[in-house]
Amino acid sequence: MLTIALSKGRILEQTLPLLEKSGLIIAKEELNSRKLILDTNLTDVQVIIIRATDVPVFVQHGAADIGIAGKDVLLEHGANNLFEVLDLDITKCKLMVAAESKDKLKQNTLKIATKYVNSTKRYFQNKGQSCEIIKLYGAMELAPKVGLAHCIVDLVDTGNTLKANGLIAVERIEEISSRLVVNTASFKTKNAQIKSWIQNIEYNL
């Protein structure tokens, strides 16, 4: 049995057509149910629906053979025991530093609000910038307005939310899109099946 880990939301919506082109169909009744393990039209493939941040964890520990996750999640989680094999070129956006102005980044110790703690730390360490990272789970754009932080690090798509809150994107950390990842052990034990899936998906990109 091959287990594929997906997360609900944009990734699932944009991945389903690609999977269908590759021969994997999940019935609407399955998708609309409260089940977390979904049957497919293929007897040897099942899909599990989990939180986006948990996809690499399930793949890393072998609870799923294949997963589809955003590059932002993979950067935060690390890549032990998994291969990143394909850029699916969907759910595209950018991980950006945003502030009220570029001058706000000129600080001895920069205060940054973000939920992307590891990516932020790596980026500013590589620049040699001393920083204090404040972990938030939402309403990131509020932090500079109320003096909580000098800037934020967040995903930016159109930039409209930043603009509406008086912020501008000042530095790009990473281009983000959904990636296909594979458990390293599964790649050896289920090599033919997994390679076939990778080739099918790559062909239909």
UniProtKB/Swiss-Prot annotation:
GO BP: L-histidine biosynthetic process
CDD domains: PBP2_HisGs
Any one GO molecular function term: ATP phosphoribosyltransferase activity
Enzyme type, top EC level: transferase
Alphabetized Pfam families for the sequence: HisG (PF01634)
Keywords: Amino-acid biosynthesis, ATP-binding, Cytoplasm, Glycosyltransferase, Histidine biosynthesis, Nucleotide-binding, Transferase
Catalysed reactions, as listed in the record: 1-(5-phospho-beta-D-ribosyl)-ATP + diphosphate = 5-phospho-alpha-D-ribose 1-diphosphate + ATP
Pathway(s) it belongs to: Amino-acid biosynthesis; L-histidine biosynthesis; L-histidine from 5-phospho-alpha-D-ribose 1-diphosphate: step 1/9
InterPro entries assigned to the protein according to its UniProt record, in alphabetical order: ATP_PRibTrfase_cat, ATP_PRibTrfase_CS, ATP_PRibTrfase_HisG, ATP_PRibTrfase_HisG_short
Entry GO terms, CC: cytoplasm
Domain of life where this protein originates: Bacteria
Protein EC: 2.4.2.17
Subcellular location: Cytoplasm
Record's comment describing the protein's domains: Lacks the C-terminal regulatory region which is replaced by HisZ.
Record-stated family: Belongs to the ATP phosphoribosyltransferase family. Short subfamily.
Functional summary from the UniProt entry: Catalyzes the condensation of ATP and 5-phosphoribose 1-diphosphate to form N'-(5'-phosphoribosyl)-ATP (PR-ATP). Has a crucial role in the pathway because the rate of histidine biosynthesis seems to be controlled primarily by regulation of HisG enzymatic activity.
Subunit and partners: Heteromultimer composed of HisG and HisZ subunits.
Protein's name in the database: ATP phosphoribosyltransferase
Organism: Ruthia magnifica subsp. Calyptogena magnifica
Source lineage: Bacteria, Pseudomonadati, Pseudomonadota, Gammaproteobacteria, Candidatus Pseudothioglobaceae
Encoding gene (name): hisG
